[in-house]
């Protein structure tokens, strides 16, 4: 039995192919982006402190370019923030050096940076944290580990 494609069949097939190809880039781009969140507190510092300030962070890593973009807000600090940045590589409970500084220590802070392949791998492995420092807590007042969402 040999089937001859009808005009309706061709139109349906064309519509299906166009629909698939128009959504394919969306599927790829979603797979190329990793989203992170963090909740910052004094209890997460190493060693922990009794500061009552809090913060929240959202970040996205474009895995094809290693570009990290972020937005962080914080309130209730003992005084003005003196520094704010990402640290790594370190798992929760450990400390590490500064990996990427924030462009400002005034909340809210938005920024972007292109990471090295090693930095991106550490971030994806859960080995980065955000830290906000004050004069009262120069080693860090609030901290939050970046968690893959």
Give the residues covered by each predicted segment.
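Metal-centered catalytic cores of metalloenzymes
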Residues: 2-7, 20-21, 25-84, 88-149
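N-terminal export leaders
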Residues: 8-18
């Amino acid at each position: 039995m040999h089937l001859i494609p009808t005009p309706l069949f061709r139109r349906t097939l064309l519509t299906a192919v166009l629909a698939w190809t128009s959504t394919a880039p969306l599927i790829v781009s979603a797979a190329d982006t990793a989203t992170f969140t963090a909740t910052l507190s004094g209890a997460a510092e190493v060693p922990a402190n009794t500061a009552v300030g809090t913060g929240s962070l959202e970040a996205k890593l474009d895995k094809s370019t290693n570009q990290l973009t972020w937005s962080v807000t914080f309130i209730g600090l003992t005084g003005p923030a003196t520094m704010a940045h990402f640290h790594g590589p370190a798992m929760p409970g450990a400390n590490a050096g500064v990996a990427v500084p924030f462009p400002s220590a005034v909340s809210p802070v938005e920024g972007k940076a292109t990471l090295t392949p090693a930095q991106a791998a550490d971030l994806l492995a859960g080995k980065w944290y955000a830290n906000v420092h004050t004069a009262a807590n120069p080693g860090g007042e609030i901290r939050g580990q970046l968690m893959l969402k």
